[in-house]
Amino acid sequence: MANILKKWIESDRRELRRINKIANKVESYAKQMSELTDEQLQAKTDEFRERYKKGESLDHMLPEAFAVSREGAKRVLGLYPFHVQIMGGIVLHEGNIAEMRTGEGKTLTATMPVYLNAISGKGVHVITVNEYLSKRDATEMGQLYNWLGCSVGINNSEMSPDQKREAYKADIMYSTNSEIGFDYLRDNMAVYKEDQVQRGLNYALVDEVDSILIDEARTPLIISGPGTGTSKLYKQTDRFVKQLKKDVDYKIDLESKTVSLTDEGIKKAEKYFNLKNLYDPENTALTHHLDQALRANYIMLLDKDYVVQDGEVLIVDSFTGRVMEGRRFSDGLHQAIEAKEGVEIQEENKTMANITYQNLFRMYNKLAGMTGTAKTEQEEFREIYNMETITIPTNRPVQRKDEPDLLYPTLQSKFAAVVDRIKKLHAKGQPILVGTVAVETSEYLSQLLDKENIPHVVLNAKNHAKEAEIVKNAGQKGAVTIATNMAGRGTDIKLGPGVREIGGLAVIGTERHESRRIDNQLRGRSGRQGDPGLSQFYLSLEDDLMKRFGGDRIKAFLERMKVNDEDAVIKSRFLTHQVESAQKRVEGNNYDSRKNVLQYDDVMREQREIIYKERQQIITEDKSLKWVLMPMFRRTIQREVDQHTLGDKKDWDLQGIVDFAEEVLIKPDTITVKDLEGKSPQEMVDYLMTFAQGVYKEKQKQLYDPAQMLEFEKVVILRVVDSHWTDHIDIMDQFRQSVGLRGYGQLNPLVEYQTAGYHMFEQMIADIEYETTRLFMKSEIRQNVTR
């Protein structure tokens, strides 16, 4: 382990030395650029564009282009990027991750690689975690880009397709991650080229890259249509599971956060629903609803995993504490929670298109990211996204004091200590930021502070509209701010007058998060740009993380230490080590889970790319689709002939071929079995193809205008492809749920899914070709058919 660590540190040092040399080259242009007039500096952009067109690479232009952007920033924004920011910019241009501490000016760092990559004209997407940050950064940094002659666009969910298209045409576009994903899916569901908004995925620079590519990696983006779900079963299963007793009828595995019926629970279910065997195949729908009702009632927690607002269940992002507007838990879990909370059950939706962020961002030609905390996940970034994580030195040394964790036996004693610490710090006017992991914790702590008459603001999933404003003021003298997780990321906490002298911002964590990275983000809010500050975590044996991992070992340790007092506090390296190893286990589990999702999703990715590529060819075709249709007709006929000419000649089913021809290709009584006798299978295929070609020519005559014929071809193909593809997504989704149950009998669920998924896809292609052939041959021509 020590050797691996040594190698990492060495390779980081080597990489920083290399980047530093390039940054020195950028610095060497500083004097030359400062002597140019505004017009001369602005003219550099067109000069770079010309050089790029003539074959000069962006890498070669980097020192000069960065220097232009840097000088432009000084003149337009009054900000001049430091040497370490130039280094960060180089990392970003090279398609890697720049880990830069909070307050080190990531937004300004990004301007240099964004400007350089905009020169190619292929488009740069700057991705932020919310629309507020998109708008803020596009407005502030857009002044610089516009001054340098680059167009800037903002993409958001309120825009019309025309406005979106304009935004994507810009040299530089600001957008949230979800909007890019939904635009991609909508583009691949469009039936007219004019309805598409994107123009290829060239270079993405992702702000808060860990939040988007790690924390949200498992979140699929889904476009749904109405399904056929029923709310009755959700209510029945909810009523049933509410009667069950813990550890008698059901058991919970805290480590994996799963819940299942015991034998006793299964018997009760069979009696309640009047069944012989709960796990008979015909009861699949019921068992699925039962599983979701159990999860909803005994795993999913109100005010932690979700909130209820205005009679609606809204998901809470477990990493940021923000409400995720418009998102719903999939696979019926959302409906099960609605049944649990007694609100209206919204009908289940059928998935029409979906993609995960992992596969969306891997489609970019070049991907880069920046964050204050990525090093703990560097292996995942390397393995899944092929990005290296480079820690950029701070401009000034970090002055923050990170104090060791304090552990208390109970939640009550822990919160009493937290309130006591807040009182002491508040008395001298030191601003305090308190981090909590759940909405209910922040509200509980708020009540305790009210009792002590300590003025404070609460920032959680329920009021994130004001979050940027609240976070901005958190560094003022006497401010006390309670924040669920790290809501308000992306907004700097600047210290108010006189705060530096009394110790800077104090950060108090009320619980360790299951990810070390989130803890580091909380600490990192203090001590920006060499400011003083302090951070400390308060823990208890009743915390979630402690209960899930290592609680028993720590309890035994406390007993050995003879710690019985309710209010006793322990500081110990052993405890800190236990907490960190618990976090590493959770991180490992989460990584495995994300990797697992990716392996399954890769099966769909390959299939999605094939379908979307074919669709795009059809939508963009401007002459004729005969080259697509004729091979389709032939393959369909070939399959049918092969199927009916198996074995000896005497066993051939020629009547079956005639029946197929009459159903799909021709009018009844056009051919008989006699017409096929004496022909080889290949001759039969050629014979039937003559009829298909005849019908095609007939349709051309009827439509007389090639543009109308092309439109007819597109209508037929797209209707069939889209209908079969959405059904296929649904079937694959259901199969993926059930394949996990096949992990017995030495069968690997992933291999099962890959194999069956391949066969299902092959079958879907055959069905598409059959249906397209039938629809084309048998449809009557009507004018003004819409796709």
Curated annotation (Swiss-Prot):
Transcription found in the keyword field: no
Keyword Nuclease in record: no
Taxonomic superkingdom: Bacteria
Residues the record lists as binding ATP: Q85, G103, E104, G105, K106, T107, D492
Membrane topology label: Peripheral membrane protein
Subcellular location: Cell membrane; Cytoplasm
This protein's name: Protein translocase subunit SecA
Species in which this protein is naturally found: Limosilactobacillus reuteri (strain DSM 20016)
Encoding gene (name): secA
